[in-house]
From Swiss-Prot:
Tissue expression summary: Expressed in the whole plant.
Function: Auxin response factors (ARFs) are transcriptional factors that bind specifically to the DNA sequence 5'-TGTCTC-3' found in the auxin-responsive promoter elements (AuxREs). Could act as transcriptional activator or repressor. Formation of heterodimers with Aux/IAA proteins may alter their ability to modulate early auxin response genes expression. Involved in the establishment or elaboration of tissue patterning during gynoecial development.
GO molecular function: chromatin DNA binding; DNA binding; DNA-binding transcription factor activity; molecular function activator activity; small molecule binding; transcription cis-regulatory region binding
SUPFAM superfamilies: DNA-binding pseudobarrel domain (SSF101936)
Protein name according to UniProt: Auxin response factor 3
Keywords recorded for this protein, A-Z: Auxin signaling pathway, Developmental protein, DNA-binding, Nucleus, Transcription, Transcription regulation
Summary of subunit composition and partner proteins: Homo and heterodimers.
Native source organism of the sequence: Arabidopsis thaliana (Mouse-ear cress)
Length: 608
C-alpha cells in the first residue's frame, strides 16, 4: 500500500523510497453512483486516495470517452483484433459489428509506466436490434452526449507540458508557463522577495508528491525545484514525455504522466494489458457473442488511433451517410499540449479494409489524405464516425499536393516543333499556348522594330497589332506585368533593301511590317527597345532615353549588341554580294535561336 512520500527526504534517501512501490488503482461501476458519472472510485491506499476519473481521462487524452453503464454501444471485433498479438491468425467468423449493452467499467493504471486502460463488460443484444433501432421501435435513450462518463463542462483547470532536456536534467527544475501556474497552482505571495510555496499533488495510484514552487530568475518565471528530480527519476521520464497537472473542483492538485510513445499513438501494450487480452481471448469472445452471454475486454485508448467501442447514436448517424471521393472533412485530433483541434483532409477512396474476412465492414473503410501530412501521425484510413464532412466536393486538382516552390511547368524540355524560315523558331508562341499562369518577373518581351517608311504612326500600328494578337492567342489568366509577347520573324521586303524574302506567315501575320529584334535584347515592357524611324542612322534607342542595352537588376542581359549591329549593317548589293549577305544573316539567325533558350533559362533562374 502506498503511503505519503516526502520527496525532500527522497533526494537524500532514494534507496528507502524505492521500497515504497505504488500500487495499481482501479475503479469499478457502482450501482449507487450518481447519474452524472457511472464510474466511481474505490480507495486503494491508506492515504485515502484513489483513481481520479478526471485524471484518468486527462492521461488518456481528449479524444477518449468512457461509456456509461447501461448505454447502447457498438463493439467492432475487427478493431479489437488489430491490437491482439495473434491478429494475423485470428479468424473467428464474427460479424463486422455487434450491438451491446455496457454492464461494467473498471479503470486501471499500469504500475511502472502509468499507462491507463479500462476493463469493460458487455452484453450482446439480439440480432434484430439494429433493425428495431432503425425503424424506431427501440429508442436509443440519451444520445451521443450521454455516452461519456465525464462531462466536457466539468473539465478541471489543467495544463500539459512536453518535457525538454532542461526539465529532465538532474541539476535543473521544471519550468511552468506563467498562465498555467496561475490557473492550476495556489496563488503565491508576490510581496515576498522570493515568492515560494510547497505543492502537494496526487498521481493515478494515489501517491502524494511534494514539490517546491518558486518564482525567481531573470526574467522571473515559475519553477518546480525541490522534489522534481526525484519524481523524474522515479517515473523514468525522458525528454519528449509529457507531465500534466490539474486542479479539480475540490481544489486538490493531481499529477499525471503521458509517455512520448502514447502521445504519438504508437504505445506498446503493457505486459498487464497483454495478459488481460490473452485471458479474454477471442475464441471466448466469439462464443459469448454467439450465445448472447457477457464478455469482458481490455480497452486501451492509446493502442490505436481508432476506438472499437463507440456509442450507437454516433454509428447510426453516419452509417447511411453518402460519403464520396473528393469530399472534404475535418477530424478531431490531439495536439502536443493535450488539447483538441480539428484537422482537415479529403476522402481519396472508399473500400473495405479486409474484404475477405470482414466484407461490408465500416471499420476504417475510408481512405483519406490529410492537408497536414505530418500532424500527429495521421492514419491513411479512418472510420466514418471519426470525421465530420465539411464543405463541398473538391475537384481533381485538390488531390495534387502543391510544393513550396513553383515548378517549371509550361516550358518544354526540348526545342519546339514550329519551323520558321532562316532557322528561327517561334519558341514563345508554342510556350505561351500552354503557359496559363505567368508570375511577375518571368515575362519575356522581345521588342518590335518597325522599318516602315510611313513614320511613327506606322510603328505604333504595328506594335498595337502585335499586342492584340498575343492577347487573343490564349492568355486566359495573365495579370499586369506577366505577359509573354513572342518575337515575330517577319521582314518587310522593300525594294530599297535589295532582299527578296518570301513571307512565311499567313492570315493576320501578313499585316505586320516589322523586323525582328535580336532575341538577346528582351526584358520587361519598361525596357523594350524601339527603332526610331526618324533617326538618320536608324539606330536602336532605349524607350526611356537610356542606352541601347537591356538590363535586369542592374546586370546586362546581352553582350551581342556589337555583333547584332554588324550583322544587320550588311550592305545590300546585286549579285554575289546579295548571297553573301543572306549567308551572314542566316548564321546570325541561327545564333539568335540558340540565344533564345540561354536567355530564357537565365531569366527563369533569376526569377526563381
Amino acid at each position: 500500500m502506498g503511503g505519503l512520500i516526502d520527496l525532500n527526504v527522497m533526494e537524500t534517501e532514494e534507496d528507502e523510497t524505492q521500497t515504497q512501490t505504488p500500487s495499481s488503482a482501479s475503479g469499478s461501476v457502482s450501482p449507487t453512483s450518481s447519474s452524472s458519472a457511472s464510474v466511481s472510485v474505490v480507495s486503494s491506499n491508506s492515504a485515502g486516495g484513489g483513481v481520479c476519473l478526471e485524471l484518468w481521462h486527462a492521461c488518456a487524452g481528449p479524444l477518449i470517452s468512457l461509456p456509461k453503464r447501461g448505454s447502447l454501444v457498438l463493439y467492432f471485433p475487427q478493431g479489437h483484433l488489430e491490437q491482439a498479438p495473434d491478429f494475423s491468425a485470428a479468424i473467428y467468423g464474427l460479424p463486422p459489428h455487434v450491438f451491446c449493452r455496457i454492464l461494467d467499467v473498471k479503470l486501471h493504471a499500469e504500475t511502472t509506466t502509468d499507462e491507463v486502460y479500462a476493463q469493460v463488460s458487455l452484453l450482446p443484444e439480439s440480432e434484430d436490434i439494429e433493425r428495431k433501432v432503425r425503424e424506431g421501435i427501440i429508442d436509443v435513450d440519451g444520445g451521443e452526449e450521454d455516452y461519456e462518463v465525464l462531462k466536457r463542462s466539468n473539465t478541471p483547470h489543467m495544463f500539459c507540458k512536453t518535457l525538454t532536456a532542461s526539465d529532465t536534467s538532474t541539476h535543473g527544475g521544471f519550468s511552468v508557463p506563467r498562465r498555467a501556474a496561475e490557473d492550476c497552482f495556489p496563488p503565491l505571495d508576490y510581496s515576498q522577495p522570493r515568492p515560494s510555496q510547497e505543492l502537494l499533488a496526487r498521481d493515478l495510484h494515489g501517491l502524494e508528491w511534494r514539490f517546491r514552487h518558486i518564482y525567481r530568475g531573470q526574467p522571473r518565471r515559475h519553477l518546480l525545484t525541490t522534489g522534481w528530480s526525484a519524481f523524474v527519476n522515479k517515473k523514468k521520464l525522458v525528454s519528449g514525455d509529457a507531465v500534466l497537472f490539474l486542479r479539480g473542483d475540490d481544489g486538490k492538485l493531481r499529477l499525471g504522466v503521458r509517455r512520448a510513445s502514447q502521445i504519438e499513438g504508437t504505445a506498446a501494450l503493457s505486459a498487464q494489458y497483454n495478459q488481460n487480452m490473452n485471458h479474454n481471448n477471442f475464441s471466448e469472445v466469439a462464443h459469448a457473442i454467439s450465445t448472447h452471454s457477457v464478455f469482458s475486454i481490455s480497452y486501451n485508448p492509446k493502442a490505436s488511433w481508432s476506438n472499437f467501442i463507440i456509442p450507437a447514436p454516433k454509428f447510426l448517424k453516419v452509417v447511411d451517410y453518402p460519403f464520396c471521393i473528393g469530399m472534404r472533412f475535418k477530424a478531431r485530433v490531439e495536439s502536443e499540449d493535450a488539447s483538441e483541434r480539428r484537422s482537415p483532409g479529403i476522402i481519396s477512396g472508399i473500400s473495405d479494409l479486409d474484404p475477405i474476412r470482414w466484407p461490408g465492414s465500416k471499420w476504417r473503410c475510408l481512405l483519406v489524405r490529410w492537408d497536414d501530412i505530418v500532424a500527429n501521425g495521421h492514419q491513411q484510413r479512418v472510420s466514418p464516425w471519426e470525421i465530420e464532412p465539411s464543405g463541398s466536393i473538391s475537384n481533381s486538382g485538390s488531390f495534387v499536393t502543391t510544393g513550396p516552390k513553383r515548378s517549371r511547368i509550361g516550358f518544354s524540355s526540348g526545342k519546339p516543333d514550329i519551323p520558321v524560315s532562316e532557322g528561327i523558331r517561334a519558341t514563345d508562341f508554342e510556350e505561351s499556348l500552354r503557359f496559363q499562369r505567368v508570375l511577375q518577373g518571368q515575362e519575356i518581351f522581345p521588342g518590335f522594330i518597325n522599318t516602315c517608311s510611313d513614320g511613327g504612326a506606322g510603328a505604333r500600328r504595328g506594335r498595337f497589332k502585335g499586342t492584340e494578337f498575343g492577347d487573343s492567342y490564349g492568355f486566359h489568366k495573365v495579370l499586369q506585368g506577366q505577359e509573354t509577347v513572342p518575337a515575330y520573324s517577319i521582314t518587310d521586303h522593300r525594294q530599297q533593301h535589295g532582299l527578296s524574302q518570301r513571307n512565311i506567315w499567313c492570315g493576320p501575320f501578313q499585316n505586320f511590317s516589322t523586323r525582328i529584334l535580336p532575341p538577346s535584347v528582351s526584358s520587361s515592357p519598361s525596357s523594350v527597345l524601339l527603332t526610331n524611324s526618324n533617326s538618320p542612322n536608324g539606330r536602336l534607342e532605349d524607350h526611356h532615353g537610356g542606352s541601347g542595352r537591356c538590363r535586369l537588376f542592374g546586370f546586362p542581359l546581352t553582350d551581342e549588341t556589337t555583333a547584332v549591329a554588324s550583322a544587320t549593317a550588311v550592305p545590300c548589293v546585286e549579285g554575289n554580294s546579295m548571297k553573301g549577305a543572306s549567308a551572314v544573316q542566316s548564321n546570325h539567325h541561327h545564333s539568335q535561336g540558340r540565344d533564345i533558350y540561354a536567355m530564357r533559362d537565365m531569366l527563369l533562374d533569376i526569377a526563381l
